[in-house]
Swiss-Prot record:
Pfam families noted in UniProt: PRK
Localisation per UniProt entry: Cytoplasm
Protein name: Uridine kinase
Organism whose genome encodes this protein: Clostridium tetani (strain Massachusetts / E88)
Broad EC category: transferase
Protein encoded by which gene: udk
UniProt-listed CDD domains: UMPK (cd02023)
Length: 209
């Protein structure tokens, strides 16, 4: 194929609803047309560290991510080559040995907290979206997710939020809002915004045909 896939970056604070927005956009297209890449899958390999040391890693800092590999994979997908995406184990705080094959599609969504903060990623994107949600809503969502899905204790989630998540949000994530083409308030519940974005993507796909 000569045309390049459309790359869409979706970011926002932890618990903002960016995953909900991403999944809702994906739901509006045929499965063979769209794929989602989670930045979380590209946390660095920490096999050389003990589990006690891994727990202390600042996972909301740019240094926690293997951005070089993510950029490489996005470029390969842009040239219609499949990639082997890492699989991350949130309970062990490390990559799994197996990987997931991701086939190139006409529309590629990359979703994560630092997607717009990282210039190397940002420069590849055709559409840049920031999901903006109140801090109190985000912390409640984070509590529910990390306790239910990631095996964390209430105390550990609260401590991590106060000492790491919130400071990193103010330092890296919130400032990246200025790079967004579209800012979505109310997260994944903003149907009007999602309708507009989906309509714009469909127009871009038609123009590239």
């Amino acid at each position: 194929m000569s045309k390049r896939p459309i790359l869409i970056g979706i970011t926002g604070g932890t618990g903002s609803g960016k995953s909900t927005v991403s999944k809702e956009i994906c739901r509006r297209f045929d499965k063979e047309l769209i794929v989602m890449i989670e930045q979380d899958s590209y946390y660095k390999d920490q096999s050389h560290l003990s589990i006690e040391e891994r727990v202390k890693t600042n996972y909301d800092h740019p240094n926690a991510f293997d951005t070089e590999l993510l950029v490489k994979h996005l470029k390969e997908l842009s040239y219609w080559s499949k990639v082997e995406k890492p699989i991350y184990d949130f309970e062990l705080h490390n990559r799994k040995n197996e990987t997931e094959i991701v086939e190139p599609t006409e529309i590629i969504i990359v979703e994560g907290i630092l997607v717009l903060e990282e210039k190397e990623i940002r420069d590849l994107l055709d559409i840049k979206i920031y999901v903006d949600t109140d801090a109190d809503v985000r912390i409640i969502r984070r509590l529910v997710r990390d306790i239910k899905e990631r095996g964390r204790s209430l105390d550990s989630v609260i401590n991590q939020y106060l000492n790491v998540v919130r400071p990193m949000h103010m330092q890296f994530i919130e400032p990246s809002k200025r790079y967004a083409d579209i800012i979505i308030p109310e997260g994944g519940h903003n149907k009007v915004a999602i309708d507009i974005i989906v309509g714009n993507i469909k127009q871009m796909v038609q123009k590239s045909e």
